[in-house]
Amino acid sequence: MVRLTYCIAALSLVLAGCGGSASVAPGVPSVAGSVPLTSSRWIPTAGESIQIQYDGKLDLSVDAAIYDLDMFDTKASVVRELHNMGRKAVCYISVGTWEKWRPDAGKFPKSVIGNKDGHWAGERWLDIRQTAILEPIMTARYQLCKKKGFDGVDPDNIAGYQSKTGFPLTAAEQLTYNKWVATEAHDLGLTVDQKNDNNQIKDLLNYFDFGVDEQCFVQGWCKQLTAYTNKNRLVVDIEYTNQMTRTRFLNKVCPSDANYKLTPILKKLEL
């Protein structure tokens, strides 16, 4: 799920209460404190601020503890600059879809490429059962992420079994793949988030380090995400302006997410 123009809206920190006059502009305060999980890996804690930008001119003025950026499009020099500013960097990678514009798109044989995902042009679902083909490609992506200096990985599209992918994917097959997605990141010393797939949180909680969920307030499943926040793990709730006004966000989402210790962000989504 990429090729979007993401626009951070004001607000996000639970500790800040999403207060003030929000606008679709940078300005999220940061919080001290990702705690080390191991000597080589860190884990974001509940309430930390995050800037997510996958496209467009990168804005490093946003005061956020963590930056989530496109892995292919972000240069190592940008990651170094973020580190010099005392920030962490997480790389976005789609592990469940084929994206025709990626430099390694030609490495995916036709046998693993399925239906269009229905939302984004040039993006198709992958047959995650064909691990002998997919794992080396994804490992190479992770290695590039690590080489660029990123601290973690944001693997998207890990719930294909819930969509019309063109393949008869089962929940069990998805679970197996998702566990590999997390384990492979850890093997490289990278932290990793669970992006959506809330139905498998209980099975994945001990594999992933934190959570990122799209529209949990609109969809009505934010409470499920407390499995992470109860362990003091960061959970980001992304709500979109195409279904959420700024006023409703401030008056409804912010207090609700504060109750669950989630970090809410309002974004503008454009193709």
What positions do the PLM features span?
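Sec-dependent signal peptide recognition
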Residues: 2-9
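Residue-level signal for mature regions of secreted extracellular proteins and peptides
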Residues: 11-12, 247
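C-terminal motif of bacterial Sec signal peptides marking the signal peptidase cleavage site
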Residues: 15-17
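Bacterial signal peptide processing site
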Residues: 19-22
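Hydrophobic/aromatic hotspots within intrinsically disordered, low-complexity regions
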Residues: 24, 28-31
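Glycan-processing catalytic domains of CAZymes
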Residues: 31-271
